[in-house]
């Protein structure tokens, strides 16, 4: 009985999460936040140095393109051009392979 109740609660939470995560999110002034699309090829190749270029489409200005970067791990900056050595994981990145071979 307890197991079936837990299964029902878990299923309910999963469905709720899926429904909520697929809903559009409103910004501070009530406008919808932009959707992400892949960058056009002419921007994708040079806009982000160490990351992925995304094309943002603002719903209040659909004709105006915005380009942004989603940086790879350990990189920061507007164009992912700065190595983030302040990230503690940066110094641990090589240790996992060393420890597993011992």
Swiss-Prot record:
Supply the InterPro entries for this chain. Answer: EGF-like_dom
Instruction: Cite the PROSITE patterns for this sequence.
Output: EGF_1
Q: What's the stated role of this polypeptide? A: Ant peptide with probable defensive activity which acts as a potent agonist of the mammalian epidermal growth factor receptor (EGFR). Mimics, both structurally and functionally, vertebrate epidermal growth factor (EGF) peptide hormones. In vivo, intraplantar injection in mice causes long-lasting (several days) hypersensitivity of the injected paw to both mechanical and thermal stimuli. Its long-lasting effect is unusual for venom toxins whose effects are usually immediate.
| Boundaries of every EGF-like domain copy | 43-81
Primary location recorded for the protein, binned into one broad class: secreted
Top-rank taxon of the source lineage equals Eukaryota
Sequence similarity: Belongs to the EGF domain peptide family.
Entry keywords, A to Z: Disulfide bond, EGF-like domain, Neurotoxin, Secreted, Signal, Toxin
Q: What is this protein called?
A: OMEGA-ectatommitoxin(02)-Rm1e
Q: Where in the cell is it found?
A: Secreted
Record-annotated disulphide pairs: 39-53, 48-69, 71-80
Entry GO CC: extracellular region
Q: Name one GO molecular function term.
A: toxin activity
- What Gene3D superfamilies would the database entry show? Laminin
Which organism's genome codes for this protein?
Answer: Rhytidoponera metallica (Australian green-headed ant)
Q: What tissue specificity does the UniProt entry give?
A: Expressed by the venom gland.
Leader sequence residues: 1-30
